[in-house]
Every structure is written in structure tokens, then in C-alpha cells.
């Protein structure tokens, strides 16, 4: 079992798919990594030898930000937006959509479960 960036790659999948289990590597970047390390993307992950795993590891660690470092970088970016109190930061803080979507209806995923207001119909009369 190949272990790259602290993640065990799934054994029975092609390399281009197995690499996507690493946070920060999608399909396109997985193909880039395979090409840079000169390994066939259709090779099964369990068939990799130590030399190939080391080449993959070296390419990923030198050229890309992945896993914990990427997660902390994203969190720091969001925290910076919240600290400077720009529009996006305020929306992050309130837990609302950031990019202009409507919120009168919809936006349930971002807002969470409905919070019912007691006696709303009585109060509106």
C-alpha cells in the first residue's frame, strides 16, 4: 500500500483515481503528477514499486500544497476575511452564502435547519 502525504492510496484503483484521495489533488492535478513523475496514469496503485512511489511523493511535496498545509491555508484565508470585516468575511461569520445567491428562499445548506419562530402567524395579524 502506497502512502503519500500521510494518506494511504486505495490499492485496487488506477493511479489517476487513487491520487484524488489526497486533499488538494483532483483529476486534472493527478494527471499532471503522473506526467511529471513519468508514470502511467492507468497503472493500478498496488503495482507501484518503491522507486515510483518515491518519485510521486517528491513531485507532490515539491510542487503542490496538499493535505494539512492546504487546509490551514484555506482556514487562514477565511479567518483573514473575517478579521478585516469585509462583505465576504461578514457572510462567513453569519453562515450565509457569499456569492450573491438569494436567501429569502433556498440557501438551506448554508443556513442550516429551519428555526421556527413561535406564534409568527399571530404576531403578523
UniProtKB/Swiss-Prot annotation:
Q: Does the keyword rRNA-binding apply?
A: yes
Entry keyword RNA-binding = yes
The record's annotation in SUPFAM superfamilies points to:
S13-like H2TH domain
Record's keyword terms, sorted:
Ribonucleoprotein, Ribosomal protein, RNA-binding, rRNA-binding, tRNA-binding
Task: Supply one GO molecular-function term.
Answer: structural constituent of ribosome
Q: Which intervals of the chain are annotated as region Disordered?
A: 95-125
GO annotations under biological process? translation
**A Pfam family hit:** Ribosomal_S13
GO cellular component terms listed in the entry, alphabetical order: cytosol; small ribosomal subunit
What this chain does, per the record?
Located at the top of the head of the 30S subunit, it contacts several helices of the 16S rRNA. In the 70S ribosome it contacts the 23S rRNA (bridge B1a) and protein L5 of the 50S subunit (bridge B1b), connecting the 2 subunits; these bridges are implicated in subunit movement. Contacts the tRNAs in the A and P-sites.
Sequence similarity: Belongs to the universal ribosomal protein uS13 family.
Per UniProt, subunit arrangement is: Part of the 30S ribosomal subunit. Forms a loose heterodimer with protein S19. Forms two bridges to the 50S subunit in the 70S ribosome.
Q: How is this protein named in the record?
A: Small ribosomal subunit protein uS13
Q: Which organism is it from?
A: Borreliella burgdorferi (strain ATCC 35210 / DSM 4680 / CIP 102532 / B31)
State the gene name recorded for this protein: rpsM
